[in-house]
């Protein structure tokens, strides 16, 4: 088995060899895992089982907080068709709003758009990803957790200030710099934080773990 830790409440498990590609065996194993978690931790969990990480993730979210959704390869298209575009990992509020402006709300709607239009609207990388994702195509392997990479930018203001617009302008500038680095390195992120030092040298910070990985800052 290959275990990939994603966050404090999310992980992927490749059990292809253990279950010999049999979805009935995979379903039985998933129920065993759910029961074990309930017995030992007194917690419920949602599990999605499918042929790749993308569909497994969507299936896991489908019946939260205590569901088990099995999507075999020949049922992927039928499963995805009525779902809202937002269920695709990486599609955030801004992208969803852009699709609404194009009168596109479901995955079935979005499948009417060709890859060239998506690439023109969202860039080649994102456009191609979305074109494949809505068709259930994903070859991202389950892999052991890699060492976390942190991207950050820091600045010292020319003057102390409580002016919201002034502070926001500087923050947006830092966000753009970090975003440019992320795009240059072809990375995605799932956690984001801000750290600042006040005029009396006290420190404050705030961080958040996102629902899905994204490259949109």
Question: Model-predicted segments: where are they?
Answer:
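Gly/Gly-Pro- and Ser/Thr-rich, intrinsically disordered tail segments characteristic of DNA damage-repair
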Residues: 1-129, 142
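DNA-contacting surface of Y-family translesion DNA polymerases
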Residues: 100-217
């Amino acid at each position: 088995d290959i275990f990939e830790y994603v966050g404090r409440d999310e992980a992927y498990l490749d059990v292809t060899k253990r279950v010999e590609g049999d979805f009935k065996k995979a379903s039985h194993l998933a129920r065993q895992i759910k029961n074990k978690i309930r017995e030992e931790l007194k917690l419920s969990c949602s599990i999605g089982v499918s042929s790749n990480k993308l569909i497994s993730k969507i299936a896991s979210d489908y019946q939260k907080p205590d569901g088990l959704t099995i999507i075999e390869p020949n049922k992927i298209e039928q499963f995805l068709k009525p779902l809202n575009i937002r269920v695709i990992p990486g599609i955030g509020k801004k992208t969803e709003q852009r699709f609404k402006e194009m009168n596109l709300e479901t995955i079935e709607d979005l499948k009417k758009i060709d890859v060239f239009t998506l690439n023109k609207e969202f860039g080649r990388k994102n456009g191609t990803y979305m074109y494949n994702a809505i068709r259930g195509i994903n070859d991202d392997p389950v892999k052991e957790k890699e060492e976390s990479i942190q991207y950050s930018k820091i600045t010292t203001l020319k003057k102390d200030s409580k002016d919201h617009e002034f502070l926001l302008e500087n923050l947006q500038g830092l966000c753009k710099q970090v975003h440019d680095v992320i795009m240059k390195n072809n990375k995605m992120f799932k956690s984001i934080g801000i750290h600042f030092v006040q005029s009396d040298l006290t420190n404050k910070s705030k961080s958040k773990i996102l629902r899905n990985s994204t490259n949109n800052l």
